[in-house]
Each structure stands twice: as C-alpha cells, then as structure tokens.
Design a protein with these regions (language model features):
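P-loop NTPase switch/communication element
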Residues: 74-90
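Switch II (G3) loop of P-loop NTPases
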Residues: 103-122
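Beta-strand-loop-alpha "switch" segments that mediate conformational coupling across diverse proteins
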Residues: 178-211
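Inter-lobe coupling/hinge region of RecA-like P-loop helicase motors
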Residues: 203-226
Length: 237
C-alpha cells in the first residue's frame, strides 16, 4: 500500500469518527490518488432523481475504470438498489463505514449525499470534489432555490452544474424552459436533460441499472445518462 493510500485511509477513518459526513467528503479530496475523479451528486430537496443519477453515473463510469459509489443518504437508496439485485451492479456501492476498504485505488468516486444540505454544507461539499451535480425538477418552485444555490457556489468558484431531471415527454417543453431559465439566471447547466420514465422505478425494484432491463423502449433513458457521462468527461479533462 502506498503512502498516499495510507494517508487516504487515515483521513477517512478520522473524519468518520467525527460523524460529520460533509467534512468527511471534503477530506477525501485532500489525499486522493493521482487521477482519481470525485463527482458529488446533491440536491436541496428530495424527489429530484439524485440517487437515480448517482447509480447511473456510477454505471457509466464503471466502463471507464474502477468506480465506487459512496452512499451518504440516510435512506441508503443506492445501496438498497444494489442489494435488491444481489450486488451485481458494475460498481461498488458502500456507505462511509465501508469506504476505507474500497475507495483506495479507485478511478471514479460518485458521492450520493443526504438531501437538503444548507449553504455552508454545499460549499464544503464543493471543495471536496472535482464536479458537483445539482439535479432539479423542471418546475417553477425549483427555480428560485436553484438560483440562490448557484449564487452561493459561484462565490466559491466551485465546478458545478445543474441537471434538469424528471422531464415530461414530448410535446412538453418544461425541460427546455427550465434549462433556459437557469441559463438566463447565470447557472451553469448540462445540455443533457433526464427524461421521466417508469423504467427507473422498475430498475430500482429489480436492483439493476436501467440499461439492464429487458425492454428496448427504455434504451433512450439510458442514452440520457450516456450523454450526461460524456459531458462530464469533457468537464473533467
């Protein structure tokens, strides 16, 4: 084990003992191995496909290298998703207590945080990752909170992007309207949007990513996350 790996283990262990997940996440970045990329998925409220996004980004990046999904959500949604499929996911899903064993030597770490972090927590989370993703539903009630969050993060010069999720199917224009409003408000936002589909709950129930469901109609939903993954790769270069 390298000195860097030993340092990483020590810092994770120490911060877990403090039982402060926000600062624990930030600490990972301090001693991460060269080339490791940390992507944090967080949201100011629940029900915005945060864990769905974490699971499918972990699936995407598992084709690029060793990927670990750190599930910090008290509901353990990502871990439960994986366990329902007998842990046959192409990535490793663990909580903070298991991270010491699995995180070293990873190429990608996807962090699924608790929902509703406050402004200070968001800033700390942003310091501890290479990219922060903020899923948001395409509705007017989500717009103002996202503008306020972006203002707070913009002051820290953090690398973050909003992601419009749960987008209704054509002919609805809600997804495009939300993207346009975010851009007008100065919020960096992904070009890719994630459409709403019954396939995601089915995948969660089966314990697999949506790409593994035997339904050709759902391939377009997986394509959304493939396109998102490609955007992220460009941002992390």
């Amino acid at each position: 084990m390298s000195t860097t790996d030993e340092n990483l283990i020590c810092i994770i262990t120490a911060f877990w003992q403090l039982v402060n997940t926000v600062f624990w996440y930030s600490a990972i970045a301090v001693y991460c191995t060269t080339g490791m990329k940390i992507i944090t998925v967080t949201g100011y409220k629940g029900g915005v496909a945060k864990s769905t996004t974490s699971v499918h980004l972990a699936t995407y990046f598992s084709d690029k290298g060793k990927t670990v999904l750190l599930d910090g959500d008290p509901n353990r949604t990502a871990i439960a998703w994986s366990e329902r499929g007998d842990n046959k996911m192409p990535f490793i899903a663990v909580d903070q207590r298991q991270a010491v064993k699995f995180v070293t030597g990873s190429d990608y770490i996807i962090i699924d945080t608790p929902a509703r972090p406050d402004s200070d927590d968001l800033k700390e989370l942003a310091k501890g990752c290479d990219l922060m993703i903020l899923p948001t539903a395409p509705d007017v009630l989500s717009l103002q909170p996202m503008l306020e969050i972006a203002k707070d993060l913009g002051a820290t010069k953090a690398n973050f992007r909003a992601l419009v999720t749960i987008v209704p199917p054509h002919p609805s224009t809600e997804g495009k309207q939300m993207r346009d409003e975010l851009e007008l408000g100065g919020v960096p936002v992904f070009k890719t949007t994630i459409r709403r589909t019954v396939g995601f709950p089915k995948a969660a129930l089966a314990g697999v990513p949506i790409r593994d469901l035997d339904d050709a109609r759902l391939r377009i939903a997986w394509a959304d996350y493939q396109n998102l993954g490609k955007e992220i790769e460009e941002l992390l270069k």
